C-alpha cells in the first residue's frame, strides 16, 4: 500500500477504485475491529446519499463482523448527526461513509472516536499498516451481528434544537434551503418549518447520483437566483454530508464564512451564552476578521487549516466558536463538529432577533485584499512535490518581498483532493494579485516539466 491514505478528513477516492473498493473497506473494518473495538465490541456506521454508500457500508460491516464486532447500521445520516450521537450509542467508534462536497462518484471513510472526535494521525497510520499486512486473527466462533437503529436521527434532532427556547422563533421569515440532495434532504426543511419559517426547498430529492450536482454549498448559483426571485430574507446551503454551511443575504450575495463566524460569536456573547473569551480560525482567514474579533473584546487564535486543528484549539481554550473560510464552523456548546443545520439555525435566530434585513447587517467588516486559489495537480505526490519545490519557495519569498513585509502567503495542500491551495493577502490589491499569479505560474510549470 503506497503512500499515506488518510488525509485530514479520512480516506477518499473514486468509488470502486483503490482505495474506495469493497476489498479495502473490508480490510479496514477488520483492522479497526482488531485495534479500536475493545470495550463494547460494537461500531456504528452511517452514510450519505451517494450510490456507492451501500456497497462500502456492506464491505465495512463485513470486516467488522468477521473481527467479532457488532455493527449498528444507522442508514443515511448527516456527519454532524453521527458525531453528535456517537457517545450515546455505547460503541467503541463510529464510521461515516461520505465524500462531503465531492461529486457522487467519489466516496470516503471517516473514522470517529467513541466521544465523537476524529482519530489522531498515529492511530490512522497504524491502521494503514494493519491493512497493508493483512494478517488478522479471525475465528469461526467470534463473529459480530448486525443491529439496525432508527433512533439516531431523533436523538440528534433533540440535541440540535435544544438551544431554541420559543416554539416559533422564525415566524414571518421566508428562507430558501438548498439541501444538496444530500443527508439533510427531508430533514432540514421540516425543522425550519416547525420553527415557523416559510421554506422554499431546493435540491431535496436525492437519487444516489445528484448529490452536490450543481447545488449545495459549492454550487450556490441557483440558491442566489431563487432568493432574489422569491424575495426571501436569507438563503442557506449545506453540502452532501451537512458539515459545511453557505449563507447568502436577501439580495443573493454570499456572506463569507469569516463574517458568519464573527456574527455568531457576537450574537452568543450579547446573549450571555459565550463560553470562554476566544475565537479560533486558521492561518488563511482574512486579517480583517482578526481585527474585528479583537475589537469585540475576544482573544483571537489561528491554527493550521482543517476542522480537526480548529476543534483541538477550541477544546484547549474552552471557547464556544471557531471555523474557517470553507464553511466549516463549530459552535462547541451545540455540536461536536461542523454542523450546517445547527449553524444555520443560529444565524437565522440572530437575524430574526435583529429585526433587520441580512443585507443591512452584512458586511460586518471590509476584507483586506486577498487571493485564494486551489491549484489542481496530477496527484497527491505532485502536490507534495510542488509544496517542497525550491522554485515555488523562491516565488513565495519574492512575493513577500514585493509586498514589503505587509502581506501574508500561505501554501496549503488539500487534505481531500490533489490540489495545492495558494492564499495571498496584503494591503495593496495590485501587489496581492501579482504575487499570487507569480506563485501559481511557478506551480503550473511543474506540471509541464
Residues covered by each model-derived region:
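N-terminal small/polar loop signature for handling phosphorylated ligands or for N-terminal nucleophile
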Residues: 34, 42-106, 190-248
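Phosphate-binding and adjacent anionic-ligand microenvironments
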Residues: 271-449
Amino acid at each position: 500500500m503506497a503512500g499515506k491514505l488518510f488525509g485530514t478528513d479520512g480516506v477518499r477516492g473514486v468509488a470502486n477504485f483503490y482505495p474506495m473498493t469493497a476489498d479495502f473497506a473490508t480490510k479496514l473494518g477488520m483492522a479497526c475491529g482488531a485495534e479500536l473495538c475493545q470495550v463494547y465490541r460494537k461500531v456504528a456506521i452511517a452514510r450519505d446519499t451517494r450510490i456507492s454508500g451501500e456497497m462500502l457500508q456492506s464491505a465495512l460491516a463485513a470486516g467488522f463482523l468477521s473481527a467479532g464486532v457488532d455493527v449498528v447500521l444507522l442508514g443515511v445520516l448527516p456527519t454532524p448527526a453521527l458525531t453528535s450521537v456517537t457517545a450515546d450509542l455505547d460503541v467503541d467508534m463510529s464510521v461515516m461513509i461520505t465524500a462531503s462536497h465531492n461529486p457522487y462518484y467519489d466516496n470516503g471513510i471517516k473514522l470517529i472516536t467513541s466521544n465523537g472526535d476524529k482519530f489522531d494521525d498515529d492511530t490512522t497510520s497504524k491502521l494503514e499498516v494493519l491493512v497493508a499486512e493483512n494478517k488478522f486473527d479471525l475465528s469461526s466462533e467470534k463473529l459480530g451481528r448486525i443491529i439496525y437503529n432508527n433512533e439516531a436521527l431523533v436523538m440528534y434532532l433533540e440535541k440540535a434544537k435544544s438551544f431554541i427556547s420559543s416554539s416559533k422563533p422564525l415566524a414571518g421569515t421566508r428562507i430558501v434551503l438548498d439541501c444538496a440532495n444530500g443527508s439533510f434532504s427531508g430533514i432540514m426543511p421540516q425543522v425550519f418549518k416547525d420553527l415557523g419559517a416559510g421554506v422554499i426547498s431546493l435540491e431535496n430529492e436525492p437519487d444516489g447520483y445528484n448529490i452536490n450536482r450543481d447545488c449545495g454549498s459549492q454550487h450556490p448559483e441557483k440558491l442566489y437566483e431563487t432568493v432574489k426571485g422569491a424575495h426571501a430574507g436569507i438563503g442557506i446551503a449545506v453540502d452532501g454530508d451537512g458539515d459545511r454551511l453557505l449563507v447568502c443575504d436577501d439580495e443573493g450575495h454570499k456572506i463569507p464564512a469569516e463574517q458568519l463566524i464573527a456574527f455568531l460569536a457576537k450574537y452568543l456573547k450579547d446573549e450571555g451564552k459565550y463560553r470562554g473569551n476566544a475565537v479560533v480560525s486558521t492561518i488563511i482567514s482574512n486579517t480583517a476578521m482578526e481585527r474585528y474579533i479583537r475589537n469585540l473584546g475576544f482573544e483571537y487564535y489561528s491554527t493550521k487549516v482543517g476542522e480537526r486543528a480548529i476543534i483541538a484549539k477550541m477544546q484547549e481554550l474552552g471557547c464556544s466558536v471557531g471555523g474557517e473560510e470553507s464553511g466549516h464552523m463549530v459552535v462547541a456548546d451545540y455540536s461536536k463538529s461542523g454542523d450546517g443545520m445547527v449553524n444555520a439555525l443560529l444565524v437565522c435566530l440572530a437575524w430574526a432577533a435583529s429585526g433587520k434585513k441580512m443585507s443591512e447587517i452584512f458586511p460586518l467588516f471590509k476584507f483586506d485584499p486577498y487571493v485564494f486559489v486551489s491549484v489542481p495537480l496530477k496527484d497527491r505526490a505532485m502536490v507534495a512535490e510542488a509544496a517542497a519545490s525550491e522554485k515555488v519557495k523562491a516565488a513565495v519569498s519574492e512575493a513577500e518581498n514585493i509586498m514589503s513585509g505587509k502581506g501574508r502567503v500561505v501554501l496549503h495542500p488539500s487534505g481531500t483532493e490533489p490540489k495545492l491551495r495558494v492564499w495571498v493577502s496584503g494591503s495593496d490589491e495590485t501587489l496581492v494579485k501579482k504575487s499570487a499569479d507569480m506563485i501559481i505560474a511557478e506551480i503550473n510549470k511543474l506540471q509541464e516539466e
